[in-house]
C-alpha cells in the first residue's frame, strides 16, 4: 500500500475516533554487480533454426578492420571489442495481436514500442507502455573484460527478417523472432536474443543465447533489465506516481521499493534466488520472470522527478542478476509480461505476481479485499454488466449483511438519548464528586443493559470493509474508465463537477467531487436525525465536512458506495425515530423486569394425609 493510501486510512481512523470520543536524476545510475551466488545448471535446449526466425551468425568485417573504422568516442565507451557494434542501420519488425502491437528494433535487439489495443489514456489515445523518451527497453547489461560497462541497447543486432515486416498473430498462434550480436566471427562468438510471441496473451517468451563468450564477459554475471520505467497513462500524475512501485520476489517474499519523496533516488540490492522483478504504474506493469532456474538476485532503483504544473513522475530500473557460467554455450529463458495489472490474469501464472496489485495491508485489509470483496464483485458483475449498478447492488447487499450491527448501533444511540434526563439528574446530584457520578452513570447503563460503546463499535468494525473497498476501487483496472450515469464517467477516479482555480493547501483539493458532496450531505442528514445531544451539535457539521474534504479525491466508486449506504441508513433511522424514546426505555425496563427470576410459590399442603398427626 502506498504512502497516500496509508495517510488516508490514518486520517479516516482518526476522524472516526474523534466521532467515537464525542459520542462517547533523469537516467538512473547503472547498478553495481553482485557477488557470486550458488551455481545453477544450464538449459541446453538448442536455438530455433534461422528459417523460423532462429539465431543466425552474420558475417562482419574482421575485428582489426572494424576497430580502425570506429570513432574514438565509441572506443572509449565500449572498448575495442564492442565499439564496432555501436553503429549500424536500424531495422524494425512489428508484431500485431488482438491485445497489443509490439515494435522490435535491431538497435539493441529489444522492444521499441508496446501499444495496448484494448486500453486508452485519459486523452483517448492508445496506451503506449514503453517509455518513448528513450530508444526502447528490455536489454542486457554486463561488464567486458577490459572493464567497460556494456548495455546492449546501444549496440546493433542483426536479424534474418526483412526490416519493416509486419506479423499478424491470431489467438493461439506463435511466432519466434531472433536477433544476433556477432561479437567476433573468428571464434563464432555471439549473443542472440529470441522472442516468442503468442496471440491472445500479454506475455511472451524470451531466450538469451551466449556462444563462446567466455573471453568477453567479466565477473561471470550479466543483467536482464527494464531500464526506463513505463509511460504514465492517467490525468493525475501525482496520483499515478503514488501507485508506481518496483518489486522483486525473493525467498517467498514480495519486496517493494518506492521513491516517495520529490527528487529522491532510492535503490535496493536483493540477494539470493529471485523469481521475478516487476515495475508498475497505477494500472499497468512490466514483469520479467526467469524460467527453469531463478535469478541470482535483483537490483531495484527508483527516482522521483517533479513535472511542470505541480506534476510528479517516478521512474524505475528493475533488473534480474543472472549467473554467466563461462561455458561454450549458455541459454537462459524468461517470460516477460507487459500489460494491465489485472488481478485474475496475474494470479493465473501462480508465481505471486498478483501481489503487485495494491489491495491493502497484507495481514488485515488484503485478505478481505482479495477473498471476499473481489469474488463478490465478480459474481455480481457476471449478471450485471455496468459496474456502477454492481456497486449499488453490492452496497445494498452489504447493508443487509451489516444490518444487525447497524440496528444495534442505532438502538443504542436512541436509548442513550432516552437516558439523557436521568443522566442530567445524576450529574446534578453528584456534581461535587466525579467518582460517584461516574459510578452512578455506569450503574444506570447496567440497569438498562446499555453498552456506552454500542453506538460506535459497529462503525469501527466496518472500517476494514471500508478500507478494502477503497483499495479495490483505487487499483482494480476493471473499474478504470467504467462510467455510470450522468457526470460519472470513470469510477476509478474522482467524479469532478467543478474545477477550482486554486489548490487548497495540505489537503491538495483543487476540484469538487459530486459524489463526495452527496455523501457528505447524506451523512449530515443522518447525523441530524440521530444526534440530539446539544453538546454534540458541532460534530453534526464537523463530520460531514471532514469526510467531504477527505473523500473528495477518492475514487467515484467508493463515494458511490458510501452515498448509497448512507441513503439506506437514513431510511433505517427514519423508521427507528418513529418510535417514541419513552417506549424504548419502557421496553428496556420491561426486558429487565421480565428477566428477573420469579420467587417460587410454596406448595399447598392441604392433604390431611400429608399432615403429622
Features from the language model and the residues they span:
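Helix-loop-helix
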Residues: 1-43, 104, 198-199, 206-211, ...
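Generic N-terminal leader/processing signal
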Residues: 1-2, 33, 50, 57, ...
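Juxtamembrane extramembrane loops of integral membrane proteins
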Residues: 21-123, 128-129, 133, 179, ...
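General structural signal for secondary-structure boundaries
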Residues: 62, 85-86, 96, 258-259, ...
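Soluble non-transmembrane domains of integral membrane proteins
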Residues: 72, 85-355
Amino acid at each position: 500500500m502506498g504512502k497516500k493510501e496509508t495517510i488516508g486510512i490514518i486520517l479516516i481512523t482518526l476522524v472516526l475516533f474523534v466521532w467515537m470520543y464525542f459520542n462517547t536524476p533523469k537516467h538512473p545510475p547503472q547498478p553495481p554487480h553482485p557477488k557470486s551466488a550458488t551455481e545453477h545448471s544450464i538449459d541446453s535446449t538448442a536455438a530455433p533454426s534461422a528459417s523460423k526466425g532462429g539465431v543466425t551468425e552474420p558475417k562482419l568485417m574482421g575485428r582489426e578492420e572494424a576497430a580502425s573504422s570506429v570513432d574514438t568516442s565509441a572506443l572509449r565507451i565500449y572498448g575495442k571489442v564492442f565499439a564496432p557494434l555501436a553503429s549500424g542501420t536500424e531495422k524494425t519488425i512489428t508484431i500485431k495481436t488482438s491485445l497489443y502491437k509490439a515494435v522490435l528494433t535491431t538497435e539493441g535487439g529489444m522492444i521499441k514500442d508496446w501499444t495496448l489495443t484494448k486500453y486508452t489514456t485519459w486523452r483517448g489515445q492508445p496506451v503506449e507502455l514503453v517509455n518513448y523518451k528513450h530508444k526502447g527497453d528490455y536489454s542486457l547489461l554486463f561488464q567486458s573484460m577490459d572493464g567497460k560497462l556494456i548495455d546492449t541497447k546501444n549496440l546493433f543486432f542483426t536479424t534474418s527478417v526483412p526490416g519493416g515486416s509486419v506479423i499478424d498473430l491470431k489467438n493461439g498462434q506463435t511466432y519466434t523472432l531472433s536477433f544476433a550480436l556477432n561479437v567476433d566471427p573468428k571464434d563464432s562468438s555471439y549473443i542472440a536474443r529470441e522472442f516468442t510471441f503468442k496471440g491472445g496473451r500479454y506475455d511472451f517468451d524470451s531466450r538469451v543465447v551466449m556462444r563462446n563468450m567466455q573471453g568477453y564477459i567479466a565477473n561471470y554475471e550479466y543483467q536482464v533489465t527494464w531500464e526506463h520505467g513505463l509511460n504514465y497513462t492517467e490525468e493525475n500524475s501525482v496520483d499515478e506516481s503514488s501507485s508506481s512501485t518496483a518489486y522483486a520476489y525473493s525467498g517467498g517474499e514480495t519486496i517493494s521499493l518506492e521513491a516517495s519523496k520529490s527528487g529522491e533516488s532510492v535503490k535496493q540490492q536483493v540477494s539470493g534466488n529471485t523469481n521475478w522483478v516487476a515495475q508498475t504504474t497505477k494500472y499497468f506493469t512490466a514483469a520479467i520472470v526467469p524460467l527453469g532456474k531463478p535469478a541470482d538476485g535483483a537490483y531495484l532503483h527508483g527516482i522521483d522527478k517533479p513535472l511542470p504544473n505541480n506534476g510528479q513522475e517516478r521512474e524505475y530500473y528493475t533488473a534480474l542478476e543472472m549467473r554467466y557460467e563461462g561455458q561454450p554455450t549458455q541459454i537462459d529463458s524468461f517470460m516477460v509480461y507487459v500489460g494491465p495489472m489485472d488481478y485474475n490474469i496475474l494470479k493465473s501464472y501462480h508465481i505471486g505476481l498478483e501481489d503487485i496489485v495494491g489491495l491493502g495491508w497484507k495481514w488485515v485489509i488484503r485478505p478481505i479485499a482479495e477473498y471476499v470483496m473481489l469474488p463478490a464483485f465478480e459474481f455480481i458483475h457476471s449478471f450485471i454488466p455496468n459496474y456502477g449498478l454492481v456497486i449499488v447492488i453490492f452496497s445494498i447487499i452489504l447493508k443487509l449483511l451489516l444490518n444487525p450491527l447497524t440496528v444495534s448501533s442505532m438502538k443504542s444511540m436512541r436509548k442513550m438519548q432516552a437516558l439523557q434526563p436521568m443522566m442530567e439528574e445524576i450529574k446534578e446530584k453528584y456534581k461535587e464528586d466525579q467518582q460517584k457520578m461516574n459510578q452512578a452513570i455506569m450503574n444506570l447503563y447496567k440497569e438498562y443493559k446499555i453498552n456506552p460503546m454500542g453506538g460506535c463499535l459497529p462503525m469501527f468494525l466496518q472500517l476494514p470493509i471500508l478500507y478494502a473497498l477503497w483499495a479495490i476501487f483505487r487499483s482494480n483496472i476493471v473499474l478504470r474508465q467504467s462510467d455510470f450515469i450522468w457526470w460519472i464517467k470513470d469510477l476509478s477516479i474522482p467524479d469532478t463537477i467543478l474545477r477550482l482555480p486554486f489548490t487548497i493547501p495540505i489537503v491538495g483539493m483543487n476540484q469538487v467531487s459530486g459524489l463526495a458532496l452527496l455523501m457528505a450531505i447524506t451523512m449530515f442528514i443522518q447525523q441530524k436525525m440521530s444526534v440530539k445531544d446539544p453538546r454534540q451539535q458541532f460534530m453534526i457539521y464537523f463530520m460531514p465536512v471532514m469526510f467531504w474534504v477527505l473523500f473528495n479525491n477518492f475514487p467515484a466508486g467508493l463515494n458511490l458506495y458510501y452515498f448509497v449506504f448512507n441513503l439506506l441508513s437514513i431510511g433505517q433511522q427514519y423508521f427507528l425515530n418513529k418510535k417514541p424514546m419513552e417506549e424504548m426505555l419502557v421496553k428496556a425496563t420491561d426486558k429487565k423486569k421480565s428477566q428477573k427470576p420469579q420467587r417460587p410459590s410454596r406448595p399447598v399442603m392441604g392433604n390431611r394425609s400429608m399432615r403429622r398427626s
